[in-house]
Amino acid sequence: MASLENPAIDSSSEFESSSEEISSSKESKPKEAPVTVPSTKTLNSPSAAVAVSDDSESEKQSFVLTRRKKKEGAAESPAVKSGKKEGAAESPAVKSGNNEGATESPAVKSGKKRASEGTTSRDMHVKRIKKEGDNKKGHAQRVWSEEDEISLLQAMIDFKAETGTSPWDHKDRFFDIAKKSISFDVSKVQFFDKIRSFKRKYFGDRKVRSVESDHDKKCLGLAVSFWGSDGVSLETPVKKKVKDESVLVKANSKEKNVKPLVKEDEQVVILGEDSEWFEESFLVPVIASLGLDEYSVKKKWSKVSVETKKRIQEKMKLVDAKKCELLLANMDVLKEVTSVLTQTN
């Protein structure tokens, strides 16, 4: 009996060992998807197992989404920074746009400058022309040296003394004679313009005369010798030819023969500077008081030679100078008497 029971026990033990080997072999196999089951009850219901699997998947998805969002957030922050940088880069672009506007303003300025340059160039051209014209005038005026001016005035005096006529009556003759004493090749227009300028300079304003320099004083003396103290020259007597014809005048129904008003070749006297100082002097009324009328006195004076007139005029200047000295002496006496009277109580 004992022997029979032992094989059974052995068989049972062998069965248990074989079952343990099978279980160990099962445990040794890798599990594909181990799922933790909280209780046996959950295993018994398939809906509960599906819910557990869905929750785990949703948790996984939420975890993945949160991870992804974090990664995207970490990736977006540089993007935002890059956006800011792009904005910062755009601001220079805007600035560059403004700079383009600023660059356009120089273009406008350049256009204005060009326009101003055009106007200024025209103005400069006009000014240059005016300046050249002024320079030409100044050059034409500077052509005459001091020696030339004195030579011209002296030639005028000599011509008038030799011929008894004015240089204006014989321009060609006077020009041919006087131009030899000029240091440059002078034209006739320049020649007589210079004579006119002398008269304007020294007799244009009788109150103020250009006598600042010694040269002007010398020229003024020569000009006075030619034109006189008042700048009115003795002109050459002008001959007017009038036909010797009778003028019929009816008076009381009777015709009377009247002599011509002006005879042929009769000289009409034009009184000039030499006659003017003579008329303004005391000589004319004194001589007229002796029995001659003033017209006859003036007419006879116009026929006197230039040398004689000049000599008498110099004497009159001495008389005038003595008159001035006498007047100054009278003024000194008057001043002294006035001062004495004011000091006397």
Swiss-Prot record:
Q: Tell me which domain of life the UniProt entry assigns to the organism this sequence originates from.
A: Eukaryota
Reported tissue expression: Expressed strongly in leaves and flowers, weakly in roots, and very weakly in stems.
- Modified positions (Phosphoserine) in chain numbering: 105
Q: Where is the composition biased (Polar residues)?
A: 37-46
What's the chief localization of this chain? nucleus
Q: Where in the cell is it found?
A: Nucleus
The protein's name in its UniProt record: Transcription factor STKL1
